[in-house]
Amino acid sequence: MKVLNFGSLNLDYVYAMDEFVQPGETRACLGRQVHCGGKGLNQSIAMARAGLPVWHAGILGAEGGILRETLTAAGVQTEFLRQSEAPGGHTVIQVDRHGQNSILLYPGTNAALTEDFVDAVLSAFGPGDVVLLQNEINLVSYIMRRAAERGLAIAFNASPFNGVEDYPLELVRWLFVNEIEGGALSGETEPEAILRALRARFPKTEVILTLGSDGSMWAGEGGSSFCPACRVQAVDTTGAGDTFTGYFLRGILGEDCGLDPLTLATRASAIAVTRPGAASSVPALPEVLAFRNGK
């Protein structure tokens, strides 16, 4: 089994703020850091640090050499990365004193995938393999359909949410949504109702619903389960959801590690929020297995 991630590759410009800048306001920041990121890159690193065999596919911008190096250092295979001289993807992130974030995204070369490139990459994968997607790249619908034709199982993190309703979500095996995304897809507001509605609409899809500090839920053919969030002091929540996604898939696809997928993902994301940055905050599997609530 191999995991292919058609995923975004960004440089994250992170600004520490006492409070978020409001419309019409100019405010000096308390500090600035530059990190490797993008939901795709973060999730590839999370899966690799969790022990899954991961191949990342995407297009690097002119300044993207450090992104390739970061993936390689984490154990991600990078033979399906292509280089472009066009501007790459980047984000401008505000992080307030509570560790909450506000993110402005410029897609850059993440929106430059071509059908020929997608087909060439998918030709190296087949039945028994998994493709992971997020919504920070173009051609998501095309990749879903072509991957399904080749017998790959599809995992999809429906973030950012724009255009998601038009995708062939019935092809997705594992759908990751937060409360806002799940509510928009289902027309419901309560977590249990969101899960019921999405399972009724997509009966072949397992739905993973993240609830922030309230925990997470997972619904599939065997019913539903809930895992409360771990109580930790958050420093930066930027990479928490990506860490959760990568470790949940490790729980599903990897060897038994003694923790169910929801608990494994919850512990990993709890560790991630205690550290600054996105990709740099992702823990390795031994650390997650040794973690206890808040410790």
Which residues fall in each region the model found?
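Glycine/charged-rich beta-loop-alpha catalytic/anionic-binding loops adjacent to active sites
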Residues: V21-G31, S224-Q233
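Conserved phosphate-binding/catalytic region of the ribokinase-like
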Residues: G163, E192-K295
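Substrate-binding N-lobe of the ribokinase-like
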Residues: K2-V3, P23-H90, F291-G294
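Short, conserved phosphate/pyrophosphate- and ester-handling motifs at nucleotide-, phospho-/glycolipid
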Residues: M47, N178, G241
